[in-house]
């Protein structure tokens, strides 16, 4: 967890790395146990595609995945990449064992902070089976108004 500020506005970045087995339950537990504030961004490998578009095989999502999506929605969180790219099939992970691609690495943010997210993109990596995700945020500098001037 990283806590800091950008342009005098607090931000918390939380990294999650879910296990391969039990990922859905782990992520759901982590999300519900966190005190998700408006300026909290959750990043990491959750080992779960959240939509059929997040798999090269376009499989239906499981009931457990829908439960996780419901939890994300109840916590007023959004999948920032999918929000910015609702129709784009782009992946963060290649499974050489299965010969498939998926987007199992995610950045989640609070719905109320949507205006602070400028752009998001997946950056290819040649050194890892996972690609990086870059999120640009747009925090406006606060101006101080002085009525005595």
Where are the language model's segments positioned?
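A shared catalytic/ligand-binding motif for oxyanion handling
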Residues: 1-149
């Amino acid at each position: 967890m990283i806590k800091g500020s950008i342009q005098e506005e607090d931000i918390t970045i939380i990294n999650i790395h879910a296990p391969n087995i039990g990922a859905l339950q782990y992520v759901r537990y982590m999300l519900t146990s966190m005190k998700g504030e408006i300026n909290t961004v959750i990043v990491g490998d959750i080992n779960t595609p959240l939509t059929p578009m997040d798999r090269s095989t376009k499989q239906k999502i499981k009931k457990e995945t829908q439960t996780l999506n419901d939890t994300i929605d109840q916590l007023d969180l959004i999948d920032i990449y999918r929000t910015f790219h609702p129709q784009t099939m782009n992946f963060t992970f290649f499974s050489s064992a299965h010969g498939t691609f998926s987007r199992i690495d995610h950045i989640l943010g609070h719905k109320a902070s949507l205006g602070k997210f400028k752009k998001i993109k997946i950056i290819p990596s040649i050194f890892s089976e996972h690609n990086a995700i870059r999120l640009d945020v747009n925090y406006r500098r606060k101006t101080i108004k002085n009525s005595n001037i």
